[in-house]
Amino acid sequence: MGRTLTSVLVVFISMAGWLGGADTGSISGILGMRDFQSRFADRYNPITNSYSYSAWRQALLTGTVNAGCLFGAMLSSPFTEAIGKKYSIAFFSGCYIIGQILLVTAVPSWVQIMVGKLFTGLTIGALSVLSPGYQSEVAPPQIRGAVVSTYQLFQTCGTLIAACINMGTHKLRKTASWRTSFGINILWGIFLMVGVLFLPESPRYLIYKGRDEEALRIMCQTAELDPESEIIQTNFNTIKSDIEMEMAGGKARWPEVFGKEVRYRTVLGFLTMLLRELIGNNYYFYYATQVFKGTGMTDIFLPAVILGAINFGTTFGALYTIDNLGRRNPLIFGAAFQSICFFIYAAVGDRKLIYKNGTSDHRAGAVMIVFSCLFLFSYCCSWGPMGWVIVGETFPIRYRSKCAAVATSGNWLGNFMVSFFTPFISNSIGFKLGYIYACINMTSAFQIFLMAKETKGLTLEEVNELYESDIKPWDSYKYVRQIESRRIHFSKEEEKREREKSKGYRGQEERFIENADGADNDDSSASSESFASAGAHSRSVFPRRSNVSEESHPTWV
């Protein structure tokens, strides 16, 4: 039951990432569709009979959704505290459907497109807080990192599928080309909204609401252990005592998010999510067409499919690295490697891609594509999914919803900055923008080294203890090793006790059998007149169930 429940949990909750990826992947291709441009672009060239967007129009069409995500992330907190993560996810999934309907029914006014993107952004931002948070609270600690990473995996899958849909619909006549792409996104919203209703609520939220029995049952299902298990009882009592201790201080207020107790973690989460976007992942998707044109490729929809496939395929690597290599090392070394990729990308693009006569160097374009793919491989194995993991597991429960909202808002602020300002900066300095991204990546590596603590394999309560301690981030792996050693010792002791109980039971059973055999021998030598009394004596050898304690014979229930 536990593995089935965890699998279902992964699929349905990670669909929240799919919604965001599908929206991003669809708009990037829709902006290039002929019918959409004829209705919503603000520039027309009669000589070439082509449409284009001004920097302001393109920035508003692509950046508005991220502005909505920024506010949506903050909206998630009051909903979580009122109705829990499960029903909040269902509610915002419905809001996503409404936003996509606004896009499908847009009239020839770009303002409705912008409003639809803003409304959709509100829901994507809220779900980006709720979904990883739900997964972190329900998943067992041994696989929590991999479970939360599936949010990013589904996000990249949604982007890839949307790019493929655009490639298939852009040749449809008139509005069907872009309305179909927007309309299919409605199906993903329905899938998540209905599916999440069949999943359990977070055990920590249930304990917070006083529903202890239901919380205990869910913990047993996900861990595949009995309620009497010492591991389950220890975890349950730890969670309950921590919640009671934190709730004794009353409901957290917004100013407390930056109070002494959690200020460090709030800043860590916000900076990690902000830098997650500023290190340049989305830059490649916004300007992939220009780079691929340098290699001689003319199909404007194919680059998005190629990069989307790489983005999706390499994210599987994170499912291994995050719970085997930990959090710190992949983030630090990933950012350093990405800095090198961006530096080479910028140098080649600035000096070699476009000649003064307007022609392109195909070899330079190929080199840039290679380092774009290497960057995406590193990003998808490190910063892509691990930012969500840090947000999901770092904060104590009393502050969790508010701190996670503030931290996730950093993600959408960074995304908005990249999508809105990149057209203006790129028009001014071209591929030199890559040098800026290279510097940001190096800054990100130092930020993780100085601030983030290793939390691989720890329960959320152990993570809280780690951040409350004076252990330096670069020494935190020692704490993890101590916890792992203690856990292994505890597991061995429990196995030893079980073996001793089993051994004691087998010894009792052997004695019962010997006594029974002795009684049978007495019966065979007894006279027929004493047979009845001998038979009665043989039955009295076996103790009655009421006379055998549960402690001495634990398998009798």
From Swiss-Prot:
Positions on the Extracellular side per record topology: 31-58, 109-112, 166-179, 286-301, 350-363, 426-432
Gene3D superfamilies per the UniProt record, alphabetical: MFS general substrate transporter like domains
Signal peptide: none
Major site of localization recorded for this protein: membrane
InterPro entries for the chain: MFS_dom, MFS_sugar_transport-like, MFS_Sugar_Transporters, MFS_trans_sf, Sugar/inositol_transpt, Sugar_transporter_CS
CDD domains cross-referenced by the UniProt entry: MFS_HXT
Compositionally biased tracts (Basic and acidic residues): 492-514, 547-557
Region feature (Disordered): 492-557
Keywords recorded for this protein, A-Z: Glycoprotein, Membrane, Sugar transport, Transmembrane, Transmembrane helix, Transport
Positions in the Cytoplasmic compartment: 1-9, 80-87, 134-144, 201-266, 323-328, 385-404, 454-557
Molecular function in Gene Ontology: carbohydrate:proton symporter activity
NCBIfam families recorded: SP
PANTHER family: HIGH-AFFINITY GLUCONATE TRANSPORTER GHT3-RELATED, PLASTIDIC GLUCOSE TRANSPORTER 4
Recorded family membership: Belongs to the major facilitator superfamily. Sugar transporter (TC 2.A.1.1) family.
Protein name: High-affinity hexose transporter ght4
UniProt source species: Schizosaccharomyces pombe (strain 972 / ATCC 24843) (Fission yeast)
Gene: ght4
